[in-house]
Each structure stands twice: as structure tokens, then as C-alpha cells.
Amino acid sequence: MRVYQTNEIKNIALLGSAGSGKTTLAESMLFEAGVIKRKGSVEAKNTVSDYFPVELEYGYSVFPTVFHVEWNNKKLNIIDCPGSDDFVGGAITSLNVTDQAVILINGQYGPEVGTQNNFRYTEKLGKPVIFLVNQLDSDKCDFDNIIATMKDIYGSKCVQIQYPIETGSGFNALIDVLLMKKYSWKPEGGAPIIEDIPEEEMEKAMELHTALVEAAAENDEGLMEKFFESESLTEDELREGIRKGLVTRSIFPVFCVCAGKSMGVHRLMEFLGNVVPFVSEMPKLHNTRGEEITPDSNGPESVYFFKTGMEPHIGEVSYFKVMSGSIKNGDDLTNADRGSKERIGQIYACAGANRVPVEQLNAGDIGCTVKMKDVKTGNTLNGKGAEWRFDFIKYPNPKYSRAIKAANVQDTEKLMAALLKMRQEDPTWIVDQSKELRQVIVRGQGEFHLRTLKWRLENNEKLNVTFEEPRIPYRETITKKARADYRHKKQSGGSGQFGEVHLIVEPFAEGMPDPTSFTFNGQEFKMNIKSREEVSLPWGGKLVFLNSVVGGAIDARFMPAILKGIMDCMEHGPLTGSYARDVRVIVYDGKMHPVDSNELSFMLAARHAFSDAFKQAGPKILEPIYDLEDYVPADFMGDVMSDLQGRRALIMGMDSEAGYQKLSAKIPLKELASYSISLSSLTGGRASFTTKFASYELVPSDIQSKLIADHEAELEKDAE
């Protein structure tokens, strides 16, 4: 394989909802380019893209697959991305290192929630988009309705390049209004027959051709002037206008294919090879300092590692994009994130499960290598003259959590090591050894996401594991003012222990003024605050600690010990043992002994006094509340609303967005435990949602009673 220059390289991501045909399209592209002699299929489990055992088990893409084709003296690096929202990380990763996206639309359903999600990702990153309507041979396909929906969602920027003469089982021909030709195929597919457009299609074809010419001309002043003069553009001028429109996202070309029979795939690849922008034509990159980086093969070496794969018999395979310069076998580079030195071994062009050894890859190219010493996903490696870092890729917040444990307790350490290793492959899930919940929590994008994680642990790592519902990180607080005092006294010969603390607790809210007095037994006492400490608690909320002791009743040197005693107590609330938060404590009196008083004595006295006061101050349980956004087809809104109301959700608003209903709500974390499964079941997998922590709020009284009873029962069980 020859070395390709930056102006000969194009990087393309294949995006689309699950079942839209991306892997089948990838197989057809490889076949059309002569990379494979025979096409595989998802059903036969022999495609180039889906080759990991877990993908073969479930029949879905789990990881993004990188491959390349050589097409008309150009190199196309293509990444086949998972379609399920559970594996959204694959799409986001791929978009960060490619230069444009082909978004497939399932001809049976038209634009789906996943279509719009993918489009939003391209919008955020400013990537060109080509829409591709697939499965035109489905009897459910209504192409005109799909186009109308797309124009409603994306506006006039959606410009048809092609349209089918007929859809359903009779699909075998389409009209290309860029080339103004008819493409047709035999029923089994194969090479297209290219003919002039038949007379009965000419009026429609000319109308769409004119719209395409106008859209292309709008991207270049010279083309616009020529269009006004002659009302036409040559094919080359059309291509130039479309290319510029792609870069500025002012044109979203719409193509048609039946990927299963390779109908239209060759023409799509011609467009990718001849029209879409090269790496060198895209806007410049920026490093973490905001500096522009030109993808120049003569510049300093800089390589970004965007993906790590764990492959049988090989180990770690590290995938990278050359951001600047050129990388060769044996190059010595420095890891900008970890400070370590790395020597690059054999580098490869990517080909799914296979790799093609190469001597050099230039700026803009994508490749992989194996057995890196200390390189993790997201790291930047630099040569001399480059001191750059590129941002770690940002992923959506996890939406589904499970507590995980090894069936054999002796495998616990092995389980943690396996989880940390596997997270290098997929950074969209998080593992947390929670001291608070006394569980190992894994958080992912959905039930299917974590189910595949469990399968890989059991089949790849040979670990038997169980999932269970994670505990909820409740909090405790108080609702009224209370006072308590406690004397700690211990005498057993020699130096004893003595400390007495008098304090007041009350609810704390941001912005409330410090008190100037307090009332006890009907008598008002003036307060002289000597010191104030506001502690932002590690688990959220605040503790405000005021020292108002007068007359030297307690030395200031004991105040840190008193604060520590209170903090210790706040780690175990009296109702359920949960962390306490948002409390103001005023220490206003106490006693000490000239010999027996010490830090331990005052810490213990403060702990008991605070606990007694907390119990008298109307303690309540708080639960975490999350902001929820659902994207739901209108037909399912009634069922989704009903389900949310049964989950104690508070509906905040509804809106229409991109052909779907957007529903905003606030919902307790407890009620989100099975929401991913429920929403998928209610909508046939056609809805999606996002969550974000919002606040802690009081639980209803009946739920508080149950939580307290459950906690007491757990304590009794532990005591047995």
C-alpha cells in the first residue's frame, strides 16, 4: 500500500439508528472497492465490521470499526459506528476524528430519534453531513414522506441528489439529478445500467436539478454570478459548489441506496471520492490552548489516540489520528498527558479485524498500532517541536446504573482490574467503588450497554458476576432549630477525659444571615460570633460552623476537634445512616477541665451533642432528583406521560423538536432505575432520553417511613 498525502485522504463516519444498515453498507463499500471478494452479512455473522464475539452474540455493533478503501487514487478512512443509543460513545468518538458523516435513514421508518441525535452531534462539532436513505426495497418505504419529514426537520439545506422511481419490492432504479442520469439494476443487484432520464421523469428531475444548482451556486460568488447569467452550472462547478456547501454545512445532500443489494453504493462512493472535502480542505484543528493546528505532513509530529481495542491473541490495539507531521515505524514520541516516552512499533492501516502494515502515515490519516507502553485513550503523543494536547472527547452522562459483584468474593480484585481495563475500550461507562453505598456501581448508557459489559466479563474474562439494583445516595437534613448539650467525662486513674459542648442546630440555606441572638427557655441571649467556618461537604451541601463561646468557657484550640466530631456525625445520619447536609451549628457554651480536657474529649462531646440536637430538629430524608429529557414519537406520548406520572415525575414542559415530542421532567433517581427498559418497551426502542443531576428534595412522608423501617431491619440483620 502506498503512502497517501494529506490532500488525498478523506475520513468518513457512518452514522444512523440501529437497524438502518450501516454495517451492510460498509460491507458493500468494501466489496465495490475490491477489498473483499464476497460480501458478508449481519445474519451470517461474517462481516468485516462486526467481528468481536459480543457483537456476533447479539447481532448488533457494539464498537466503532475502522477500515479503509483505496478509491480512484484516494484513501477513504471509514468508521462504521454503532447505531444503538446505548453505544453512543462510538458515534461521538468517530465524529471527533473524522471530517464528515454519512447519516443513514431507515427507509421503513424515516428519520428517527437516533437520526436527530446523530445530527446534533455533527452540528456541535461542525461536521459536514450527507443523508443516505436506505432500504428502499422495503414495502414500508414512503420516500416522498421521508423527504418531506427531512425538510421539515432540517429545512431547505436538505438537497436531493437522487430519488427512486419506485420503492418497495419493485425498487430497481433511481434518478441522479447531479449527473442527470438514470441508474437501474437487475433484481439481484450488480453493476448499474446508466441511461438517459426517461421522458416521464424529466420534469421532476429538472425541478430537482434546478434546486440543486441554486443551492450549489449560493456557496460561491463566482458560481452565483454565472448562475444569474446562464441559469446553469457545469458538473464540475456543481461539485465545487456542493463541496463548499458541505464544509459550511449549508448543504446536506440526500442519496438513495439499497445497501443489501449494493444498489447505489458505487455511485455514493464516486461522490465521496470526487466531491466531499479532503482533510486539507476542512477548518483547522485547535489544541487545548486554542492554537490552530494545520494538518501538514511537513509539520512537527503530533498523534491523537482516540480508541483502544482489546483483541484476542493480540492484546491492546491503539487507534490514532495523525494531527500533524508524519508518523513512521520506530519514531520516538513523548506522551503529553503522562510525560512518558514512547517508541512507535509497527503501524498499520485499519481494516476491521485485520491490519495492513505501512511504513508511514501522514497528517490527517488514521491508523493503529499495538503494544504501546503507557498510552491510554485520549492521550496525545508529540515529536520534537510540538508541545500540544488535544481535548479528551466529552461523552453524555450515564443513564443506567447497576451494582456489580463477583459471584466468588475471591474474584473481587480481579473484577475491578477487568473493569478498569475494559473502560479503556469504552469510556462512556463509569465504575465507582462507592464507600457510601458499600457497592461497586457501574453506570452506562442503558440496559443493553451494561448487559454487553456483563457478557464480556463472563465470556472474555471468565468472571461470574451478578447485577443488582444500586442503593440510592439519600441525604438527611433538618427542618427546625434545636438545642442540645453533652458532657463527656471519663476518669480511670491518671489523666482523665473531660469536655462539655452546648450547641444549636438549624437548617441552612444559601444567603441566610448569621444569627445575632437565640432564645432558650423563653429567654433571649445575645450572640457574639468569634469565628465562622463554611464547609462545602464532599457529598454535597454545606455545614456552617459558628463559634459563639464567650468568657473562655472553651478554648479556641478545641474548636477544630468540635468541628471534626460534628463532621464525623454528619457521615451517619440518625434516620438511615445517610450523609447529612445543609446544617448550621452554633457552639455557644461549654466547659473544660484544666487537666483532663483534650481534643478527643471535645470531639466525642460534640458528636453526642450534635446527634441529640439533630434528632430533635425535625430530621428529614432527601432524595436525588434528576432533570429528564425524553425525545418521543408523538404516537407514544400518552403512554410515556402515564408511565412518568407513576414514577413520581413532575412534568416541566413539552415541545415539538425535529418531528418528535420533547418532554422535560424532574424525576427521583429511585424511579430512574428501570426507566431505560421501560421507555424502550413502551416505544419499541424509538425514543431516547438524557438525564442530569438537579438537586436533593424531601421524600414524601410514606416513603420516609419505609426507608427508616428498611434501615432498622438492616441494622437488626447485621447485629444477628
Question: Where do the protein language model's features map onto the residues?
Answer:
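Short, surface-exposed connector motifs at secondary-structure boundaries
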Residues: 73-75, 98-103, 126-132, 248-253, ...
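Accessory interaction regions appended to the cores of large information-processing enzymes
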Residues: 149, 158-160, 164, 168, ...
